[in-house]
Amino acid sequence: MGPVDDAPRQEHEIEEIEFAEERERLRLSGIESRRGVRMTPELAAFVADVAGRLPTRKLVSLFLHVDTRKEKAGLFGRRTHTVRVCEEVGKGWELATFAPETGSGEHRLVLSSDGLLFEARRVDAAFHRGIPKEGGLTLVPTSEDVIALTPDLRSLFSDYLNPRTAT
């Protein structure tokens, strides 16, 4: 195996190290990722409220667990394992999901200010009016039970934004 052959493996290892460092920095290393709860309207409102209080254009690398135990055809690969809240886009906050093991690349979700989730899909401009000739992203509604948050992570998420009240 030459250096060129090792590039994808090294890139994956670097990604894993960065994920681990970020989790450690945010005190997330002890959380059991399989204890997920479905996204409810109340939880969606909570996440939207928190996102609305984040400084505009600030990149926030908070990782949330994505529950893939229930099949959602065409939305996520079965091994999708992390979501992070990214910088503000348009009228909502972009959630980018990473699925390196499936080879399917990166999917994007947008959490609107009213707590609704949308999937951002790349589309061919030939099939959609109002999109630039080179194509672009379109938002389509997605189900509310895709994202799972553990109670511990919800608490940490809240504490992250309110450090004075953190226990």
Which stretches of residues belong to each language-model region?
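Contiguous, amphipathic alpha-helical segments that mediate oligomerization or scaffolding
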Residues: 2-65
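Arginine residue identity/basic-tract feature
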Residues: 9, 23-27, 34-38, 53, ...
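Intrinsically disordered, low-complexity regulatory segments enriched in Ser/Thr/Pro
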Residues: 76-151
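Short, charged, intrinsically disordered terminal tails
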Residues: 2-11, 157-167
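Intrinsically disordered, low-complexity regions
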Residues: 11-14, 25-28, 73, 82, ...
